Amino acid sequence: MLRNTSRVLMSHFARANIPTPVNQPMLNYEVGSTHRKLLKEACAKFRNTTIDIPCVVGGKEIRTGDVQKQLICSDHNKVLATFHQANAELLKLAVENSMESKAQWESLPFEARSAVFLKAADLLNTKYRYDVLASTMLGQGKTVWQAEIDAAAEGIDFLRFNVKYAQEIYQQQPPANSAGCWNILTYQPLEGYVVAISPFNFTAIGLNLSSAPALMGNVVLWKPASTAVLSNWIVYKALLEAGLPAGVIQFLPGSGRLVGEHLFNNRNFSGLHFTGSTGVFNDIYKKTADNLVAGVYKGYPRIVGETGGKDFHFLHNSGDVENFVNNTLRGAFEYQGQKCSACSRAYIPQSLWPQIKDRLVTGVKSMKMGQSDDFSSFVSAVIDKNSFNNIQSYIEHAKASPDAEIIVGGKCDSSVGWFVEPTIILAKDPHYKSMEEEIFGPVLTIYVYEDSKFEETLKICDETSPYALTGSIFSTCRYAIETAHKYLKNAAGNFYINDKCTGAVVGQQPFGGSRASGTNDKAGSSLNLLRWISARTIKENFVPLTSFTYPYMIDPEN
């Protein structure tokens, strides 16, 4: 017993030297390379095989018989995978098993937990690399480079850097001790279980949402997006092969409604790690608040969410035109604008607009749109029919509106896949519909402002959208940059200067926004991990108290 207690305390202090994390180098998959050959083979394998994916509870694969399909979004007549949806009975079992598994997992020393995730990182970089890339490309519509920076590089970075951040947290101790006492901070996981709900657009996010709380000693129930089940299943298998014990992370594809009914109404619900739409997050937030008022929970659940965005590029008339154009083409249209950080509105000074317009139009027309596993494609299809219909509705609105003009793109074709051309809308009104509302597709709306109204337009940029995720200022004038800082300090949780508003790197740019974009708990940093632990202060006194009285009470005259 004493030895076990010693090991637990060791985990709180995290004295072991961990491997120093560095950002995972990205491969280019150039013609003739072995990497390109192996990735193409993996894509061909998944195109010609339908994978059947179970739920996993307590380490056991469970097939409920309620089967749904994940399609290849750029070729939607082809089924990439089938998956079994968790039902009410299974969700109840998952909660019970999680709570049964909790004590043993959280008692493992930090080094032992870390070893699981560090090994998983190496497995994703070797054995599982091409499978997770190919499944992300076909299932989620990512071209090879977009899959590489997500499913390989970012996913691996999350696993490695989170271990470093966790160690730094555990090493934080009170800086002072009064004479005769010792002060200790210990860090323990939350009292119940954590629910992870992940989106379709980043395989790495699904991995981080589930693994970050688990690294800190929590048990997790993970609901992956139905349009990203295959890639998420592959990273889950890597975690299991790395030694993740049964019951630590339960894998539960299925209905968001059922998850809400059964996982958020339980006394042991202690945290939510979420990435998805603002509307869904608001619904969950309200549900948990209502349950809290009703006395359902033991304590206050930790609610962590990264949601929508209406991200911007703002060009000052001193800005480098070529740099702005190239960063905007990438920021707006890579991955079909389906990054929560994607540039979807831009503000351009009138004096620079003619040359920028020509370059943007030329750039968009040169983009090849095709199958995601065609290595010459720059963009591919959007994720599903609902997304296609939503994006198309904004394009049709612009075509019919006297306040907007489509200057390039605008075609939509769902005959083979959910293809939407990269589209640029010129808005006469800075509050035009597509300047304000999140679209989540390859649609960029531009407002051209008078050069003399720079500050006025910055104010409009700040007040236009309810979101505050990412944004960029392009300028070579330091005064203009500082002015933008002043006006936009609350408009973007990740703010870029002369760079695109996408592409945050783990360990370099912690990611998250505020307002309607989420709780700004900064994935890829220790700030996020702090949400998954509860700190406990311990004071030990070494000097016995010999009297309860104080010196002021002693009167020598009495």
Curated annotation (Swiss-Prot):
Principal cellular location given in the protein's record: mitochondrion
Chain coiled-coil ranges: none
Q: What are the residue positions of the site described as Transition state stabilizer?
A: 201
Q: Where does NAD(+) bind?
A: 198, 223, 276-280, 438
Any one cellular-component term (Gene Ontology):
mitochondrial matrix
Under Pfam families, the record lists:
Aldedh (PF00171)
The record's PANTHER family line, in alphabetical order, gives: DELTA-1-PYRROLINE-5-CARBOXYLATE DEHYDROGENASE 1, ISOFORM A-RELATED (PTHR42862), DELTA-1-PYRROLINE-5-CARBOXYLATE DEHYDROGENASE 2, ISOFORM A-RELATED (PTHR42862:SF1)
Q: Report the family membership.
A: Belongs to the aldehyde dehydrogenase family.
This protein's name: Delta-1-pyrroline-5-carboxylate dehydrogenase, mitochondrial
- Per the UniProt record, the source organism is Dictyostelium discoideum
Q: What is the lineage of its organism?
A: Eukaryota, Amoebozoa, Evosea, Eumycetozoa, Dictyostelia
